[in-house]
A protein has these predicted regions:
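Short hinge/gating elements
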Residues: 41-44
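Flexible glycine-rich active-site/ligand-binding loops centered on an Asp-His dyad
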Residues: 32
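DNA polymerase processivity clamps
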Residues: 1-29, 46-159
Length: 159
């Protein structure tokens, strides 16, 4: 097929046309200024590295997500020796506690997230195993797999 690109002062248009003369048009706004340095938010080093089964984690996060609400939408992940405890507690909804086996050796530590922000990248991955790296409860964490993929996720403060 063919692609026709039209650029004006404040937008760009991409017209996609195939052999059957059917097509699609994508229009985007152009913004002024320099592209932000996204590498600044990607942690270069991490204190903790955890390896987990993607499907098992995904199902556990979905179950924990049921026990959250708009006001209290966090799931706490507590990592200990080869064990992950996922907890969510919403007074008007209920409480969830689930454990799963992981590959981790280190001190016990916890971090909390909006579960949907963890579920979204897991849904996009085909790998069976993921690596989660983080430094502390308030710094960004990184989801990695054994290929060029990186997903930065911000934790939530919990009381």
């Amino acid at each position: 097929g063919e692609v026709e690109i039209i650029i004006t002062e404040n937008q760009a248009s991409f017209n996609l046309i195939n052999e059957e003369k059917e097509g699609a048009r994508v229009i985007t706004k152009l913004v002024e200024g320099a592209y932000p340095n996204y590498k600044q938010v990607i942690p270069s080093e991490s204190k903790y590295r955890v390896t987990m089964d993607k499907e098992e984690l995904l199902h556990a996060l979905r179950r924990a997500n049921i026990m959250t609400s708009d006001k209290a939408n966090s799931v706490k992940l507590t990592f200990s020796e080869n064990n992950l405890l996922l907890t969510s507690n919403t007074p008007e909804v209920g409480e969830s506690r689930e454990t799963m086996a992981i590959n981790y050796s280190g001190e016990e530590t916890s971090i909390a997230f909006n579960p949907q922000y963890f579920i979204d990248p897991l849904n996009a991955l085909e790998e069976e195993e993921i690596h989660f790296e983080f430094t502390d409860q308030l710094s960004p964490g990184v989801i990695k797999v054994n290929q060029p993929f990186l997903y930065v996720i911000m934790p939530m403060r919990t009381s």
